[in-house]
Regions:
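Viral virion structural and adsorption modules
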Residues: 1-162
Length: 162
């Protein structure tokens, strides 16, 4: 199945809709304007929609499979994810990166693992202290609550108890 994104006037994805591969082949082929125009004749745009652009479910073209609120960069011919947090910036591959690198220590290092780090980005923490942002807790691999219930901060090289 072919997938088309419906874009608004700012190239923001409003919807992703299914099309027919045979229609693509008979109307200009993959990624063609002709195929998108034909799709529009079969599936009219919504009130906010201005055009269709094909996206690849298998990530074969236009960087990645687009979703609602993705941005289509027509100059680079790719879909870019929404910015996850205000402090994150795009890298040279158009992937969002946090101002503090992702944690590299993700478990206890034992074999077999006994616990892993469960972590997430906290924008409020970062805005109040730009040396912090990742918050983590220990989580047992068997889903039992870990005896260490403290919350930790990632400092870029290690987890530090609050």
């Amino acid at each position: 199945m072919a997938h088309f994104t419906e874009l608004d006037s700012n190239n923001i994805v409003l919807a992703v809709k299914l099309g027919c591969n045979i229609d693509i082949q008979n109307n200009g082929g993959e990624q063609s304007e002709q195929a998108a125009t034909h799709f529009e004749s079969v599936v009219p745009l919504s009130e906010q929609g201005v055009k269709y652009v094909q996206t690849s479910y298998n990530h074969n073209f236009r960087k990645q499979y687009a979703g609602i609120n993705f941005f289509y960069d027509s100059t680079k011919d790719k879909f870019i994810c929404p910015q996850p947090h205000p402090s994150w910036s795009l890298d040279s591959n158009d992937d969002w990166q946090p101002p503090i690198t992702y944690p590299t220590i993700i478990d206890d290092g034992a074999d077999p693992r006994i616990w892993i780090w469960s972590y997430n980005w906290n924008e409020d923490v970062y805005q109040s202290d730009n040396t912090k942002g990742w918050k983590g807790k220990k989580l047992n691999t068997d889903r039992r609550v870990h005896t260490d219930t403290a919350t930790y901060d990632w400092n870029g090289t290690a987890w530090v108890a609050e």
